[in-house]
C-alpha cells in the first residue's frame, strides 16, 4: 500500500470563518434545580428549612421544627444502645414528631412546586450515610430510604438477639437515635433519598 499524505484542514464549505458556529441546543430547556429543603438534626430539635433559590428568597417561609433531636431519643434509650422495648417506644415518639411535617411539606412557598430535594449537613446523619456505604466526597452523595431501612433492620436484628453485636454498626445511642429519626422521617414524608452536603 502506498503512503497517504495528510492535507491541512480546510474550512467547511458554506460556513464563513467569522460567523458563529450553529447552536444545536436551541429549544432545549435548562430547567432550574428543584426546590430544596434542608433537614437539620440537632441534639434537641429536628427542623426543616426551605433553601433560598432565585424564585424563593431567604425568609420567604416559616421553617418546621419540633423539640425532638438525637439526644432526646438517645436519652429515651437510657444513653445506651436500645432494647426492643425502648426502640418500640422511641418509634412511637418519633412518628408523633415527624408526621406533622408532612402537612408542612404539602404547603410549599408561593412559586415552588414538587418535586423537592431533601438535603442535610448534620454530622450524625452523615455518619449514618457513611455506615450505609455512601461516599460523601463524591457528589452527588445520596442516601436512599432503602439503605436507611437496611441499616435499621440490622440494628433491629442486633437488639433482638441478646449478646449479638453487629460490629459494622456504631454502638452508640446517639447514632441509633439519628438512624431511627431519619428512617421515620423518610418513610412518613415519602422521600426516596436525602442528599448529603
Each language-model region and where it sits:
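N-terminal polybasic/positive-inside topogenic patches
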Residues: 12-22
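Helical "lid/coupling" subdomains associated with nucleotide-phosphate turnover
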Residues: 25-36, 65-197
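Conserved catalytic-loop position in the HRD/HxD motif
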Residues: 40
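Short beta-strand scaffold segments in enzyme catalytic cores
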Residues: 46-52, 57
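Beta-strand initiation motifs
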Residues: 56-64
Amino acid at each position: 500500500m502506498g503512503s497517504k499524505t495528510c492535507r491541512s484542514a480546510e474550512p467547511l464549505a458554506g460556513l464563513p470563518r467569522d460567523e458563529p458556529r450553529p447552536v444545536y441546543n436551541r429549544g432545549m430547556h435548562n430547567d432550574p434545580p428543584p426546590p430544596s429543603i434542608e433537614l437539620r438534626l440537632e441534639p434537641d430539635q429536628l427542623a426543616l428549612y426551605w433553601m433560598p433559590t432565585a424564585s424563593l428568597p431567604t425568609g420567604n417561609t416559616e421553617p418546621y421544627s419540633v423539640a425532638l433531636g438525637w439526644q432526646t431519643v438517645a436519652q429515651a434509650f437510657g444513653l445506651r444502645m436500645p432494647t426492643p422495648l425502648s426502640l418500640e417506644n422511641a418509634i412511637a415518639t418519633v412518628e408523633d414528631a415527624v408526621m406533622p411535617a408532612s402537612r408542612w411539606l404539602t404547603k410549599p412557598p408561593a412559586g415552588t412546586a414538587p418535586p423537592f430535594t431533601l438535603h442535610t449537613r448534620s454530622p450524625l446523619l452523615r455518619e449514618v450515610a457513611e455506615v450505609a456505604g455512601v461516599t460523601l466526597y463524591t457528589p452527588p452523595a445520596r442516601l436512599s430510604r432503602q439503605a436507611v431501612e437496611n441499616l435499621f433492620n440490622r440494628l433491629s436484628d442486633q437488639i433482638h438477639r441478646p449478646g449479638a453485636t453487629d460490629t459494622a454498626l456504631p454502638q452508640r445511642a446517639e447514632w441509633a437515635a439519628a438512624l431511627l429519626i431519619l428512617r421515620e422521617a423518610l418513610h412518613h414524608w415519602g422521600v426516596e433519598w436525602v442528599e448529603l452536603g
